[in-house]
Amino acid sequence: MQKSGLIKLCFPAAWLVATSWMFAAPAPIQRGQLKHGAPLQAEQKSVPAKPAPAKAAPAKKTAPPKAAPAKKPAPAKPALAKKPAPVKPASAKAPPPAPAASYGPRAPYRGAIAVDADTGRVLFADNMRTPGYPASVTKLMTFLLVLEDVQAGLYRLDDRAVASPLAASMEPSSVGLRPGQSMTIHDLLLSIMVKSANDAAETLAEHAALAHLRRRGAPPQDVSPADLCAAFVARMNRRAQELGMRDTRYASPNGLPPPRGSKRGFDVSTAADLVELGKVLVRMPKALSYTSCPSCTVTDGAGKPLTLVGHNYFIPKNPDPKRLCTPLPECDGLKTGFTNASGCSIMLTAHRNGRRVIVVVLGSAGRHEREKAAGHILRDALDAISIW
């Protein structure tokens, strides 16, 4: 009886000792889980575990491994999903549609201007300082320099200029010059003003450069056609600066785009610059006699007559086959220009009651846009000077 009573008294005490871990353990587990970011409610559910003393120690060891896997997928997967957003591919495709230095055609034009040739008064201006490719309007500077050489007595209009292989290789428009063939300066000037012949412009450029070398006493036989052309183009740019054509850069005597693989670049100008060239040309003796020709006959390099038909349909007696513009009786020049890269350009001049205007339309998207814009601007300019 005493043993059983002692056992009864000792059993509650032993039970309390064995189960006392259940009341002391939860607090540290909760603090540990909060430090690692695990939710407190989820940890509280695991507190009322079975009171087996042997499982108490493993319970603490297995808790951290469960929390660790929970941390890995949560931050890693969403972060990776945000990084491959399609922002960078879009920015990589943005630059190509906007090339850095593209001065191609625009509707209705890249720039336009009309001035009173006598006073310099601007009658109309729209983007007059916007650069563009003048195409064959470039030939007007070649035309001016050759006329100035003739005036200076460097050579005469009836002198003959010989076509080089470089000149003969120019693409159309052309008068069909072959290497070694020659034409008079007069006929070559008609060829570039009426027909817009690229081979004629190159031949004139080389002939003019050669004449300047001879005047300085340089040996011309050691100079290639390409070097002669480069010397003439340098002179074109010097003359442009003298005329105040500050945004103009000539690269050829004819306005053709650069060949593939070439480093020379395009001829570049503005409507405001080109009108400065026009002011000088309309004061040049005999200049308008060339620019006002609707058609003419020259003697080609083979000694045969060659009829040339002009492209300026604002000039009287030169009807437009496509009827895109109506000739003006007062119009007597100057030059059209077109390439695929440059679009359509034109410089016009006309006079009324002793007053003269000059109009430039640069870089139109097509002939229709060019003729429409140039016709409106020219007629309005003539009306404006008539009432002043």
Regions found by a protein language model. Name each.
Residues 148-166, 287-293:
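Short, well-structured active-site flanking segments
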Residues 121-129, 183-185, 328-331:
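Glycine/charged-rich beta-loop-alpha catalytic/anionic-binding loops adjacent to active sites
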Residues 120, 137-146, 161, 192, ...:
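Residue-level preference for non-acidic, small/hydrophobic
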Residues 130, 169-174, 253-261:
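Surface-exposed aromatic
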Residues 2-27:
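Sec-dependent N-terminal signal peptides
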Residues 168-194:
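Signal peptide-directed extracytoplasmic domains
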Residues 28-37, 43-50, 55, 60-61, ...:
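Beta-lactamase-like hydrolase cores
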Residues 27-40, 45, 98-100, 105-109, ...:
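Penicillin-recognizing serine hydrolase domain
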